[in-house]
Structure formats: C-alpha cells, structure tokens
Amino acid sequence: MSLLQSALDFLAGPGSLGGASGRDQSDFVGQTVELGELRLRVRRVLAEGGFAFVYEAQDVGSGREYALKRLLSNEEEKNRAIIQEVCFMKKLSGHPNIVQFCSAASIGKEESDTGQAEFLLLTELCKGQLVEFLKKMESRGPLSCDTVLKIFYQTCRAVQHMHRQKPPIIHRDLKVENLLLSNQGTIKLCDFGSATTISHYPDYSWSAQRRALVEEEITRNTTPMYRTPEIIDLYSNFPIGEKQDIWALGCILYLLCFRQHPFEDGAKLRIVNGKYSIPPHDTQYTVFHSLIRAMLQVNPEERLSIAEVVHQLQEIAAARNVNPKSPITELLEQNGGYGSATLSRGPPPPVGPAGSGYSGGLALAEYDQPYGGFLDILRGGTERLFTNLKDTSSKVIQSVANYAKGDLDISYITSRIAVMSFPAEGVESALKNNIEDVRLFLDSKHPGHYAVYNLSPRTYRPSRFHNRVSECGWAARRAPHLHTLYNICRNMHAWLRQDHKNVCVVHCMDGRAASAVAVCSFLCFCRLFSTAEAAVYMFSMKRCPPGIWPSHKRYIEYMCDMVAEEPITPHSKPILVRAVVMTPVPLFSKQRSGCRPFCEVYVGDERVASTSQEYDKMRDFKIEDGKAVIPLGVTVQGDVLIVIYHARSTLGGRLQAKMASMKMFQIQFHTGFVPRNATTVKFAKYDLDACDIQEKYPDLFQVNLEVEVEPRDRPSREAPPWENSSMRGLNPKILFSSREEQQDILSKFGKPELPRQPGSTAQYDAGAGSPEAEPTDSDSPPSSSADASRFLHTLDWQEEKEAETGAENASSKESESALMEDRDESEVSDEGGSPISSEGQEPRADPEPPGLAAGLVQQDLVFEVETPAVLPEPVPQEDGVDLLGLHSEVGAGPAVPPQACKAPSSNTDLLSCLLGPPEAASQGPPEDLLSEDPLLLASPAPPLSVQSTPRGGPPAAADPFGPLLPSSGNNSQPCSNPDLFGEFLNSDSVTVPPSFPSAHSAPPPSCSADFLHLGDLPGEPSKMTASSSNPDLLGGWAAWTETAASAVAPTPATEGPLFSPGGQPAPCGSQASWTKSQNPDPFADLGDLSSGLQGSPAGFPPGGFIPKTATTPKGSSSWQTSRPPAQGASWPPQAKPPPKACTQPRPNYASNFSVIGAREERGVRAPSFAQKPKVSENDFEDLLSNQGFSSRSDKKGPKTIAEMRKQDLAKDTDPLKLKLLDWIEGKERNIRALLSTLHTVLWDGESRWTPVGMADLVAPEQVKKHYRRAVLAVHPDKAAGQPYEQHAKMIFMELNDAWSEFENQGSRPLF
C-alpha cells in the first residue's frame, strides 16, 4: 500500500494534496469549518508560507467561494502580530481596492491538534497576483501608459485609505507581489501582517542598542528591494513613517514602466544614495518620470505625500481622458478572456506574504489545473514534471554555491582592509571560518602581502598565516586602551605604506564590535572621515551593523581629535575624581524605589578603588532623595573605567556577610581629553555602557563625575606613542588600491558629515575660565621612560620613511630595539622576507630612498671629524623670558654648527638641562626634519647639544645653567656660556657618561676649573634623572664605589663614528637617553654604597656592552654590540646575554625594565671593593630611639587587611556570630571541613561530640555517620531554654546547608 501511495505521490501535481508538500495539510482539506453563520468546506490548498496556509473554501449553503487563511503560532509575539493583522483588515475593509474581510476565528494550542494556536481568516477570493498577469503580457510588449496609470492609481487609492486612518496605518511591505487582480479586474491590496501604526524619529539621543532593535524589527517586516534609505541607515536620523510607503510606490511605478526594479539586487549603498537611472531613450512613460523622481527622494521629508501623488495621477488621467478607477479589462482580455469565464465564482482571494504566512501568491497554473494528478501527464504534464525537476536541480546547485560562497565570513571594507570572524580550528571550524580555508583564500588572493591583526583574547598558531599575526586583543566588553588603539593604527599604516599590494586583515571573535573599533579608528587615523558616525556608517554598509557601545565610539572620536587639522594631544595631568552623582536615583531595587549603589574604579586593567562594604553599611538611596552620590576621592590618569553596581542582599548572606551585586552601568574614558578647567564631567543615559532595561533609568537620567584636574603633569611609566608623532603625511589614499576606488568610496560615503552625536563625547562644566575644552597637549616635557608596554611584546613599530614623525626619545627607542633584537633570532618565516615575526611584529621597512641615505651619510660625517669647539658669536636677546623652561618639549633636529645658533625667541630656557633632556635645535616646530629610517634610530644615538626649542618658536636662548649637568654633545659649551662647574659633575671633560651618549667632547673652556679635584672620580650620571619636582640630589653618590677602569679602557672594534646595535651609523637626530622618573627616589642609591669593595678591576662583559662606565674620548654610542648585523634584517640583532653575576643586583625602581636593558643584557657587573653588608631591621634602632620613636614595630597590631577587617567587624558584631564566622571562613558548605573543626566552635560544657579528623571522613558513609552524630549533639531542640540555644541554631543551620550541598554534588568520596 505504501508503494502505491508513493507512486501516486510521484504522479501527483505539485499543487495537489497527494504530494509531500501537501501531506501535512491534507487532514484539513475536506473538512467542514464553521465561522459564525458560514459553514465552509475546505476544497484544496492554494498556497503556503512560513507559518500560514491559504485554502480555497466553499460555502455549503450558497456555493460561494472564499479564501481561508490558516495561521499557526507557537509564540505570544506571533499571536499579537496575527491579531493585529485581523484588526487592520477589519478596519480597512470596505474600500474597493483593499481585499474584503469576511470573518475570523481562533483556537488555543490546547484545543488544536497541531499543538499550536490556530487562527482562521476568511476573505474574498481573488483571481491571482498581478505579477502573474504581467508575466503573461511580457511577450506581447510593454504595458500601455493608460494601463500603468490605472494599476498605479488604484494602488495609491488603497494606500491613501490606510494613511487616512487615525493613527495612520503604514503598510511597510508594499510590493507588486501584494497586488491582486479581482474578478472585476480591479486592483486589490492584501497582506497587512507587516502593517503598523508606529513611526520612529531617530535623533542623536538614540543609543546604538535602540537603533539595532528598531532595525531588526523593521528588517523582519520589510522586503530588501523595497526598503527605504532611512531604514537601512538609521544613523541618518531621518524619520521613519508613512513616507516609506511612498518610496515603495515609486519602486512599483518604476517596475510597471520599465519591467525591472530600480534596485534589483537590493544593494544597500545604491538605495541609501538613491542611485537609479531612468532609461534615457524612453518616450512612452515620460509623463511618469518626474513622479518617479519625486517619490524616490533619499530624504523622506522631500518625498511627496500620498495625497499629492493621487492628485498628480488624477491630473494625468484627466489630461489623457482616462478613468483611473475603471477595471483593467485589458489584462483579462489579453490573457485569453480568463476573467469573464469565471466571474460567477465569487470574490477573489487574499494572498499573504511570507511575513504573515504566504510568500509567493497564487500561481496561475493552479487555477488552470486545480486538480492536478495522473491526467496532467496525459495532457502535457510530463513537460511540466521535467521542467520542475530541472528547476529543482538548478536551485540545489545554486544553494550549494551560495553555501560555499557564504561559508567564508570575510568582508572588504576597502580593497586593502578586510574584516572577518575568528579563524577557528577543530570542531568549531564547522560553524565558523575554517582557518585552512581562510589561509588558502588569503594566499591565493594576496600571496605574501597580508598581515593579520587578532583583536580577540584567543590565539592560534601564527605559523598558519606565515608568522604575520599581530596579537593585540583587549578585554571583552570594554573599549581598548588609547595607546593600544593608536599603536594598532600606526602599525597598520606602516604595513600598508611598505607595499601598495599589502592588505590588513582584522578579526575578533565575530568580526563586529572590536573589529569595527579598530577599522573605524584606522579610517579616521588616515583622515578619510572626521567623525565616528561616518566611519561606523561605512562599516555597517560594507559588513554589518557593529553593535558598538558608546565608549567604543568615544575612543574612535579620540582618534579623530588626535589627527584633526588642529590636533588635540592628550595631556598627562592626573584627575581627582571626587564623587559620582546619579540624578535622578535609578530604580534597581526589587520594589523599584531606589538603589544601593557602590562603585569600582579601574585604571587600565588594574582596580584602584572600590566602595563596596557590608550590605548594611552602604546607603540605600530612594527616589525622594533626588540623586545618589558615591564619594570616591581617587586620583586617576589614563584609561579609566568606572563600574556602578547595585548591592542586593541574598538569603543566608547576612550570616555569611555576603551580598549579590548587579551591574547598573559602566563608563570608560581617557583623562587626557578632560579639559584642564573642568569640574564636572556629564554623561547622559545614551553615553553609558552595559545598561540594563530602560525602565530602571528615569527620564533625563544622567551621571556626573565631580573632578579636579591637577595642575602638574605626572610622567607616565612609558612614553605614549603619540608623544612626538607628527600627523603630517596622513592621507586616505593609502586605504585604496586605485584612484577609481577612492572616488567611488567618496561618492558613496563622502557626503557632508553630520555633527558629532553626544553619545560619543561627554559634556564638561568648568569651574572658572572658558567652558570650552582647552588644548590638551602637555605644558611640560612629557615622560621619556623606557618601559615597554605589554602591547609592544606583540607589535613592534617602525616609523614612516617621510618627514612626518616627530623625534622620539632615545631611551624608548633603545627599549624597542631590545625587543626587536629579541624577536630577530626567533623570527623564522616560510616566506622569504616575511614582514612580521611569529609573535606578530611590524613589517620590515622598504629600503631607504637614495636621497635620504645620502642625507644620513652627511650627518655621520659630522661625527667622524674631530673639530675643536668654537664659541658662537653673541646673539641679541629678546624680551619675554621663560625662566623655568616650561614651554620646552622633547624634540630632535639636525646637528648644526655653533655659528648656526640664531637669535633666540622671547622665551629664554634657563633651566632646560635641569628640567628636561638635552635636545637638538630645530628651525621650526618640533618635527623629524631628517626623516631618519627607524632602523637607524633603534638605539640611543648621541645628538649634538644645542638648546631646546620652545614650542612653535625658533631656538631657545643660551642656557646659563647648562654646565651644571654633564656634557651631552659635540659642542659642549652652550652659546656664549662658559662651563663654570662642569668639573664638579664630570669625571673628565672628554668622558661622556653612558646615559648621555654623544660625540667626543671638545676641550673644556678655559674658565672651567676643578676646584675640588673631583674630576678624577668616576661619575655615574646615569643615576641623575631629570624631574621637575624632585631632582635626584644624590644621583652620583654611588660613583665613589665605582671603578674608573673603564675610563681608560680600549675602545671596542665596532667603535668609531657612532654605531647603533645593528652595526649602522646612528644619525645625530636621535635624542639623548635621559629618562624622567615618575617618582624619583633621591636615596635610591644609598643601598649600593659598597657595591664593589673588593677592588677587583672591572672588565668588559661579553657581547660588547659596557656596564655603568663612562665612554672613552672617542666613544660614540654608550651601548654597542659586537655582533654583525643580519643581512636584510629589519631589526638589529640581539646579543646573547652574558652569564649572571653572583653579586646582588642594584634595586630597580622601574615598573618593567631599565632604560638601558635588563641586567642580563648588560653583562656581568664586576664588584670593585666588597659585597654589600646585609642590613638587619634593628640596625637603626638607636637612631629611632633617640628621636622618641619606638625601636620595634608594634607586634600586636594587625598586619593584614583581613585582620583589620576583623577588628573593625568585632566592634559592632555579636561575639557569638563572630566566632561562627571564624569557623566557617574558607569552609562554606564543605561538610568535611566543618565536621573536622566542629569542636572548635562548640560551647563550653559540650561533651557529647568527639572530635574527628579528615581521615575519618573519606567515604560518603563515614560523612553521613558523623553528620548524624553532630546533629544529635547540636540540635536546637535539645538546647531549648539553655543560654547556648541561639549558638546551637546557627551551628545546626550551617551543618544542614553543607549536608544539602554534599548531597546535591552526588555524595562523592574524598578520593
């Protein structure tokens, strides 16, 4: 029987009930359905959609035919949508151009056989879709202008009826497939499943989350080809209302006239920009051209209203003497008189779209052959059968091709920037990008010219992409650190500059938020856009909506500010956050009456403050309070994250002093962009990250940070990458492969940019002065510390080869050089000359231009020739004097002869050598005038000592205090200033200390004299760190214990003119390695007074390094390597570290490593006299006792934070509860631990309990036995009326909770 059934199914027509497609609905066919007074017999299936089926039903009494729509729903949301559709149809029914509503009914899922709620919708039966009739007429030529006029006019009449309702009903899914042809030949509009009365008015206050929700809802109810620009681009902030139906009507009119859709492929960019074309040689439909243009306006406010459209159509009809309301009989006549033969069948059917259950409409073949089956084959059905087989095969092939094409999730933002999701391995690769497929794709399309940037915390083997992977991820649900984001942009820019074929491939986990932040920042970094909205918009169009948070957009705006025409450089001033104020009080309590907030503050990845306390000690703010204030009083600098939580008390948490926390929101910003005179930083509701549901935040909710910007700069531990970088030369053309591509992108996305939305930048209130944000570049010399950040362990930067980058201090370059040396040996690429190492380093730089190399040779000649120092001619002074040199900044410039000293500016820098590093003079703003290759600047090279240049002015005046510090240049004398005290601090006039590498010094001036004969002492100026507030007064103290053997040591073979570690001559434009300590310790060297008391001579360590010694008169670079440079290497090679010394190393106060490298990189440090004596804690007790201090610390006081908390808790806590808390500490719900220590918490006089050890509680049976014994011993019923009754209750509760946890975990044995 089953074989016969299968044969019948095969022979059945595609629309019949015997096929597989109709088997699920066959039980409904043939049944009798009662809807009110009508008894209907279901005859056959007309169509089926996503969750609805359309049947032909006949009234048993009158024989009239209807269309019965059966909708199935298993979700409450679908139920509401179906009910809304029924309501709209009832409201709109009666119009001649809208499908007539007859009746409706529903049953719940409990009564339904399908297990889903069922809805029945009865409407008139129509002949079929208009599109089917139009297809029949295609072979006969285009439609006449009068036919188009009648079809479109009747459609607009239906839409006008919808828009006249109160409130207006928006169809939202107008398309030619939803236009039916009635029995009488009139147009009928159907499918109101997507209709709505809600309009949206986006503005700058909308958050990204709100936009995403609206976009998702609209996308679910619209068709791609008919979507409007304001729907696709919600960031345009155009209103979304009735005018979206006008756009769809324009598409329908275009389709009726020219037989093709204006946006056939549904391309978003073409729709957003309104890029369509009317055939230039069309003369038949000229009367409609202006109407099409007026309806397809990108700005919805410029489109015609439906009343204006109908009015223009009436004028056209009057001019052509046509009645637009008359039936369109020409369609029925040209289709063989199909309509007249069946007019007695009754009203035509409604047809629903996919959104409401029916997607395709009623096919004409189903009317021609309503009962397909075996007779179809005899009447030519064989042809249709094989046609269907062919169509099915082609669809299968197309779906397989689409799957293969879409299997690789990669999108090109430009031809040189690609974004993809995480390249997965193993089982995960079946769902995501397979890493092998990604590699094959990139190798075939960009062989040897792509670099991968991994922004996710997960990693994979870099060898999969030929060791060209940069690991630069950051924590999830946060914005990246500003220096990390800047370094990524700079590295991508350097990689794209090296070769016009190079591309950057960026990925995070899903290729959305994190990738969008990096890519959009890079687009702004290259000055393609000047606002974050424009960059995010391009990313959304090219890939997908990124779903970024306000803090993400805020950091993209930071990048825009830093590369603007008037750049804003983040200042280095700390900020005191006094309090966090929330107004009004957010509603996070269970009663929605207020909140109990506490705050956590993070600087970078480190938590620096928390206001969390015991639940009862934190204030509960109510709505009546008006605002919630959290006092902080914490000083922060850099990337700051403030997280606000709501504290909730949990059941049983009172006993264990625990509570639950619920995140309310978080804020992330960089302190360098807070104006100096700001007192309040305001964040509106749309500026907050990680927000909860909107009902918990009252209207006009905002968060204010009460801040105070400290007047002095605080040097950072590492020099920020933007410190002296020049933004000249940044051009968006680097993002594109051709000029045509650039012009195409500019034509699509280069529209006038909107002003910034307030979601990306906070508002500031100033206490005094101008409320506008001042320039945020630092007033004092920034830090030049040599710490290498964690990011530089995976990304090593090389500056561009143009004159566009500012000078960087030599110490940071030396540390980067050390990092690059570490990587050079381990870098092995399977492609020759791969630009990035296995740890994801910077690509190699191209060879220098000949002109640049020649310029560097000339610079080296300055160091090769020994010339006596020539005093410059006196120069006239100008009036304004900068006595403290606060306007100087670190810069490097070309070496100039002494006579080249020009007249100084009005600011005379008198203390430049005391408060800032020695600098080279420049003729203009501080720029890299020599355009050195970063390879030559990889190690500290000695600049000539010329006065520092004030910002934006000519060289500074003479420095009368310059001789107080060691000589730092070839011409050691400042202009017209004798070195009066040079011998006090210099061991020799020609000896250059390690921390101040320079060319050989000139003879001392005649007026200089070593009055105290201290010149023979081996100095150690490397200890003298510059600081504006705390100078290192004892910087050279340890020089007494150092050996002077190195002062006369022979020069290594590599020494001559200046050499960098790579073996190449170092240019003079690099700066001296003078670091500024963040917290200088003037007594840092006291512990090393006797570091070398054995008198053994100091020798040179292996590797050519000279530790802590002064260079020879001919010495150039203080640190050198004897290893020859690798051929074609982009980084200097690394010298192997020497064996470690046995002596105790000096204390290191740097956070990561020293400016001049780690101890193993500098070699063995030979002791001079003797080892350091060990200092005990009582060595200074006599000094302390004489001054009235106790010689010994108080041993009774708390030593840990936990002990301090216990003491604080003991002040207002019941001693009994305190004893119990001590017992359960670290043993919460651990039955074995509680039983083994139960004897420590029992009351006095309890003798029934015998202590047990952990060895007696191994097996579950043993635990159960001793638990029962413990319960019998401490049961509260046995302690009734006793003074220890409450004590017994608390012990019993803890044991009971622990036993329940033990059973829930399966009563597992201990081993």
From Swiss-Prot:
Group of enzyme by EC: transferase
Residues annotated as domain Protein kinase: 40-314
SUPFAM superfamilies: (Phosphotyrosine protein) phosphatases II, C2 domain (Calcium/lipid-binding domain, CaLB), Chaperone J-domain, Protein kinase-like (PK-like)
Main location: cytoplasm
InterPro entries: C2_domain_sf (IPR035892), DnaJ_domain (IPR001623), J_dom_sf (IPR036869), Kinase-like_dom_sf (IPR011009), Prot-tyrosine_phosphatase-like (IPR029021), Prot_kinase_dom (IPR000719), Ser/Thr_kinase_AS (IPR008271), Tensin_C2-dom (IPR014020)
Active-site feature positions: D173 (proton acceptor)
Gene Ontology molecular function: ATP binding; clathrin binding; cyclin binding; protein serine kinase activity; protein serine/threonine kinase activity; protein-folding chaperone binding
Domain J residue range list: 1247-1311
GO biological process: one example: intracellular transport
Residue span(s) of domain Phosphatase tensin-type: 399-566
Name of one Pfam family that matches: Pkinase
Compositionally biased residues, Polar residues: 967-976, 1070-1080, 1109-1124
Protein location: Cytoplasm, Perinuclear region; Golgi apparatus, trans-Golgi network; Cell junction, Focal adhesion; Cytoplasmic vesicle, Clathrin-coated vesicle
Modified residues (N-acetylserine): S2
Keyword Repeat: no
Function: Associates with cyclin G and CDK5. Seems to act as an auxilin homolog that is involved in the uncoating of clathrin-coated vesicles by Hsc70 in non-neuronal cells. Expression oscillates slightly during the cell cycle, peaking at G1. May play a role in clathrin-mediated endocytosis and intracellular trafficking, and in the dynamics of clathrin assembly/disassembly.
The protein, known as: Cyclin-G-associated kinase
Organism of origin: Homo sapiens
Source lineage: Eukaryota, Metazoa, Chordata, Craniata, Vertebrata
Gene: GAK
